[in-house]
Every structure is written in structure tokens, then in C-alpha cells.
Amino acid sequence: MAADDKVAILTDDEEEQKRKYVLADPFNGICREPEPPSNETPSSTETSAIPEEEIDWIEKHCVKVNNDLLISKVFYFFFYSAYGSLYPLLPVYYKQLGMSPSQSGLLVGIRYFIEFCSAPFWGVVADRFRKGKIVLLFSLLCWVLFNLGIGFVKPATLRCLPKIPPTAHPTNVSHPVTVLPMNSSTVAFFSTPPKLLQKRDVQLSETEPNISDIDLVSTALTLTSEPTRRPQTEAITHPVTGLILNTSTVTLPPTGNVTRETTIAVVTTTKSLPSDQVTLVYDQQEVEAIFLIILVVVIIGEFFSASSVTIVDTVTLQYLGKHRDRYGLQRMWGSLGWGLAMLSVGIGIDYTHIDVLIDGKGCKPPEYRNYQIVFIVFGVLMTMALIVATQFRFRYNHFNNSDGKGKEVEIPQVERDNSTESSEETPTAATHSQAFNFWDLIKLLCSVQYGSVLFVAWFMGFGYGFVFTFLYWHLEDLNGTTTLFGVCSVLSHVSELTAYFFSHKLIELIGHIRVLYIGLACNTARYIYISYLENAWTVLPMEVLQGVTHAAIWAACISYLSAAVPPELRTSAQGILQGLHLGLGRGCGAMIGGVLVNYFGAAATFRGIGMACLVILLLFALIQWLAVPDEEEDKTMLAERIPVPSSPVPIATIDLVQQQTEDVMPRVEARLPPKKTKHQEEQEDVNKPAWGVSSSPWVTFVYALYQVKELIQLTRESRASEIQPLQVTLCWASVASAPLLPPCSSKHMGNRKTGMLAKDISGLRSLCHSVYQVA
């Protein structure tokens, strides 16, 4: 009886279709759409409605989730949680190690350059040898090992030194010490070496009768003089720094006929200075050693770990298939994890401190935060991302598309569809490539119109790199806490997500160029506002502008350039833009910004970059007004399928599935189907029995009048052009070709008897002909 069970047969057919669909295109499945209702039996709807009621909430919302995209979401969450818990705090961690702003900016900015160069390299290696999963896992392992190594670097030694103002004629340590006659001998003391106190020379004048009044913390001075003029060298030891100073030459002037040796006894005076007269200084030799060690670790670690995000982005885009515009829905989980991790770690650091050993007395111990918590959290979260990454599936079937053969033999229909689509679009792509090659792309981007947009993209990346590196540095100078840093991170990421979802609407409303105007204006206001801060917590209102100055600017630039080039060159244009904005822009912002902060201070640098934003805004507006006509701006051509990153890590720059370049084209809106008549809807409704023409002449006459009346009513409403032809025309063609039994009689005439239909076949042919003429 199983063969007679139509419901069981339907279930088997549906499972077979699903299996074929999954084998045919494993990366295009986003959600399982409901199967169309079958019209083979009236009871199918009743039987299908029963299981839907029995499906519980867990099976409906969890079982039907796409597992591949779920893995991508979880990976993005853990990876960017680890990234957000550590990397925004690295500049202030370097500051606590005793590094200068220029050194900190170099350590942060060099990552962008290495990442931009190494990520495409490892992507090509992974594709060439088909070892994407191994490269991904190795890069994530390097993330854990090399970054944890930075957290175990021992800080430089802190020394407590007196703050004695220099006199009018300071002497250096390399100058000889001259001792005048004993009645008024003056010893020109030394200054600390330049590596201990930069630009500070200390001179100590002491008279021998008042030598006990030397105002030093601890000084041991030994002088040995002879009546001759023979130079004598002595070693001067400074217990404060614990260093043995260079030897000095002591020359005694003639004191008459004195033949005996004169020896000055050792005088040691210990006296604690007030805390306002001493300062804490890092040992610069140790700081330089720490800087070189971390620099080597960063260069090696970043080279091997930079490819992880590129590979995961590429796999996620393959999972999405034709639905690449949904990349932002996957990537937003990373931004969510970033904000939550940054806030949690910031609160935890505020309640943990470490004790610092100081070489010297009189200095107040500083309040140092325990940043080892950050590295521990980073290691745990990145390890979780490494475990999740083992579940990624890597398919390299796109490399075999040129052979024209597939391993699956059950999907010929899908392969034929893809071949027909590619064959239809091949001539246009060939003509585009002949008329528009890569050098034409370079010439286009070097023009005034698009070159100015690229410069704005670079400068906005410069500003983002500077803010990412030195915003928390400046807020810490204003007594800002890591909890404040976490709140700032949450606000900025919420702003970026909001701007991401509404950026294309904003571009469509006001245009690409005006969005760039707004971004430059917001940057000007934000930087100048930050430069005049006195309370660190007042920075929060300006953090909501992060979405406009980052996400909206990126979307406008990449959409503007993508609309100007043909589809086959969009990947190249995207790579050039990413290189300028994410690589060169942010790297220069961190490194050049560090040099400026080192010489002018953080507040003055913020103010200067804000004024530079204003100048660039005016120049850019002038260029667009003079050199670019208004008709060049096409607001309708939007590259909505290109993802918008909301982090310093660039997205994939290599298009591995080049056969799907047509998927990046702006989608064509589907036309609405023509309006159907009420009778057509009733005829196509499988829940109602078939309503066909009866053998009775009265029913046939009423049926014809009803059709004519409905057609006349629709014609009066000026909708006749949008109406589908009645299905009776199909009956007319079938009747004309089959004199005995029309094929459509099974649908329109129900389960009528064949003999009755044969009697009325001639009348039905004339009826169909008349209705067809009226339609």
C-alpha cells in the first residue's frame, strides 16, 4: 500500500529534490524556502498542515539554521572579541612600558603595512596548493603565540631622580671637573646622561666650607689633590642612579711653596627631597631593548597571522553565494563581540593594579594597571576562534569549472543553467575587457574626479589610524579610565553598525560626494572637540560620529568607484581602495601621528589634524565644483553587495570565485506579475475543486457571459494591458489540435466523464474561440 500513498511519494520526491539541490550548489543556501503546495490531491494541504502545527519552537528556529553561516557568525564573534579586547589597548600598554609616542605609533602602524602585503600572499598560497584550512589554523595559532609573547615582556626600570633646574651655564658630563683654590673652590658637577634625562643638564656648585649643605639625596664625593700640577682622575659614583660616571680630570692651580699632599675627606650627605622635586624616569636603554624585541615579534607574528581574516571572509562569501549582500549580517556579530569584550575588559582592568619597584627614594609609586588580564582574555577568545575554525569547509570546485565537468552526476540542470548564464554574459564581458583594461582603470583613478576621492579615502584612513592609536593615549593623560575606553568602543561600534545599515539609503538620497562632505565635516568637529577636552568623559558625545566618519565614508568611496568601472575590474578597484584606506592610510596615521604627538603633544596634534580636515574639505568641494559636472553623479548606481568592514582588519581582497562576478552586479528589480482575474485565481487555487465547462448548455452560456462581463469591466478600468490571457486560450489551442479530448480538461472540467466531453467538443471549440476574440 505504500505505492498508493501519494503523501509518502511526495515526501520522497521532496527529499530527493532537496538532496540534489544541496549537492548542486552548497554555498548558495541561505534559508530553506517552503516547497510549493502540490495539486495532485486535495488532501495534501490538510496533511501538510498537521506537521506544521506539531513543529516546536526549537525545531523551527534552530534546526533549520544554516550551519555553515552559523560557523562564520561564531568565528567572527570570538575573533573580533579577542581583537577588540587587546588591540585598542596596546598603545596605552606601550605607554606604560615607557615608550614614546613615536615608538608606540610605529609598533601599531607597521601592522597595517605588513598585513596589506602578506594577506594576499598567503591567500594565493592557500588557493594554489589548496591548503586553505591549514593556512587558516596556522595563522590563528600565530595570533595566539606572538601576541601572548608581548604580554610577558618585563617593563623598563623606573628611577627616582631629582628635578634640579639648570643654571645659566650648564656643564655636560664629558666636560672636565675644575677645582679652584681651596678658599673658594667650586666643583662643577655633572648632569645625568642624556639617556636618563633627556635635555636636562644639572650643575652643582658647592663651596668647600659649606660642603655639608649639599642638597642631594645621596652623594659620595672624593677628591684627592696634590701640590703639583699633575692631572688626577677620579671616579665619581652617584648612588641615586647606581651608575659609575665617567672619570674627570682635576687640575689644581699653584698654591705657593706647598710640598705636602692635601686630601679632602669623603663627605656623604643623605637627605630626602619632597615629592614635587623628584621625578620618575625610565631607563632608556632598557626601553629601547624592549622596543626592538616587540618590533621583531610584531613583524614576524603579523606576517604569518594576517591571512586569517582574508581566508574567512572568502569562505563566508562562498557560503553566501549569490546572496553576498548579506555579508554584513554575518560580520555584525564581530562588531558585537568587539564592543562587549572591550567593555568587559575595561571594567576588569580598572579594579586591578600592580605594584612597581622604584630605584631610589622620595618618589610616589605610580598607579599601574594590570594589562596581563587583557592578554589572558585575548588568548582564551582567540583559542575559541581557533577551535571554531576547524569546522570550516573548504571547497575548490571553482578551479575545475574550466574543464566543464562536475563530479556530481545528479545536478545536470544546475550546471546547464550556469553554463547558459555564463555563455550569455561572455560576449559582453569580452567586449568590456577589450575596451577597458587595467591601464584604463589606472588612468581613470588618476583623473581629477576619482583621484580626489581616493585622496579623501586615504586621509580618512589616516585619521582613523591616528584616532585608533592615540585617542585612548590622550584620554589617559586626562585621567581617563579603561572603563571609559570600553564605553567609547561600544558607542563607536553601535554607530558603525547603524551607519552600515543606512549608508546606502543616505547615498541614494544625497549622493556619494555629499556623503564625503559630511564625513570630512564630522571629522573636523570631532578632532577639534577632542583637542579642547578637559574632562575625559566628555568625549562620549563625539564617539557617535564614528559611523559617519568611517562606515559611511567607506561605503560611499567603494560604491562610487565600483559604479565607475566594469564588473570585471571591480575587484581591482576594491583592492586599490583598500590599500589606500586600510593599509597606507591607517599605517601613516599611526606612524606619522606618533611623531607629531612626540613633538607637539596629543592635544595640539588633534587640533592640527582637525584643521587639516577643514582645509581638505574646502579644497575637495572646490575641485568637485570646478572640475566635475553635476551630471557625472549617478545616485542610482550603488554597489550594495560590497561589504563594509567596521574594524581595522581589512576584508578579503582576492576574489576566489571569479565565475560569479555577475553576482556583484547591481540587482535588477523584478517586475510585478500581471494582475489576474478573480476567475483565474479560483481556477489556480488547488484548495477548490475544478470549475470547468459543463455539458449543459445553460451552464456554458452563463459561463461565457460571466467571462465577457469581467473582461469588459477590466477594460473600462484601463488595465487590459496588464491582464494575463485567459487560460481558455490554452484550451483553444489544445482543442484545435486534439479533436477528441483537450489536455486542459483535467483541470477545468474536473472529474467529468469522457463520453460527455466528447459530445460537447464542437461547442466547446466555438466557445473558446469566441472568448479568445473578446480577450
UniProtKB/Swiss-Prot annotation:
Topology in membrane: Multi-pass membrane protein
Swiss-Prot/TrEMBL keywords: Adaptive immunity, Immunity, Membrane, Phosphoprotein, Receptor, Transmembrane, Transmembrane helix
Molecular function as annotated in GO: MHC class I protein binding; MHC class I receptor activity
CC terms in the record's Gene Ontology section: plasma membrane
Record's subcellular location: Membrane
InterPro entries registered for this protein in UniProt: MFS_assoc_dom, MFS_MFSD6, MFS_trans_sf
Signal peptide (UniProt feature, chain positions): none
Gene3D superfamilies reported for this sequence: MFS general substrate transporter like domains (1.20.1250.20)
Name of the coding gene: Mfsd6
Official protein name in the record: Major facilitator superfamily domain-containing protein 6
Family: Belongs to the major facilitator superfamily. MFSD6 family.
Organism of derivation: Mus musculus
UniProt-annotated stretches for the region Disordered: 28-47
